[in-house]
């Protein structure tokens, strides 16, 4: 298949190596015999989401996030239409907050979000920087990574991580984290999240094939990624039980 990835604001929203989520997805899809084009969408640039197979945005500073919101919100109707059509999307880090109804910054200023989801985000001056060990209903493997966040997100009815044994979730310590509905996935976890979690990468690939109406063939497993996940999961689980 010929597949297109839309990478929104890669220069602005790419903290913590977020771009690697696109790199590993592209490589995996190509190893499966697909031709993959990555289209970089810069601030103010137009994007045709109707022909996208994967939409991605990474993490940025709080200031960068507001700049991204200013331009991304102009594409709100197109993003919602693509989500309704089943286009696979991943929003990593604080780009997740753009999907909600509002973002309130640490000075109390309120910004309108896309309204793709019903949650709200309130940012604080205090940051939470810590490792994460959690669980999703999508598969059995633990979800690992780390967060560097300053927000409390309320109103998420369908989180990506159902529970956490370590780390701050949407509303506080060890609670549900992220957002997932249909083919839209979002999480504050970095690492990058798809590199740290091969099982979640597999979910993305399967969602892309499902949207295309194609049967997903066997997905190649990167042994270094698999070993990295196993070691990280073992170490974090041990810390959880202390």
Summary of predicted features, one role per range:
Residues 107-177:
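Pocket-forming structural segment of enzyme catalytic cores
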Residues 1-81, 195-242:
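N-terminal beta1-alpha1 cap of cysteine-dependent amidohydrolase-like domains
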Residues 62-136:
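Cysteine-nucleophile active-site neighborhood
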Residues 171-209:
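A glycine-centered loop/beta-turn motif at secondary-structure junctions
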Residues 1-3, 140-143, 179-185:
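Beta-strand-turn-beta hairpins that frame and shape the catalytic cleft
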Residues 9-11, 150-152, 191-193:
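Glycine-rich beta-alpha junction loops
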Residues 54-58, 90, 186-188:
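Structural motif
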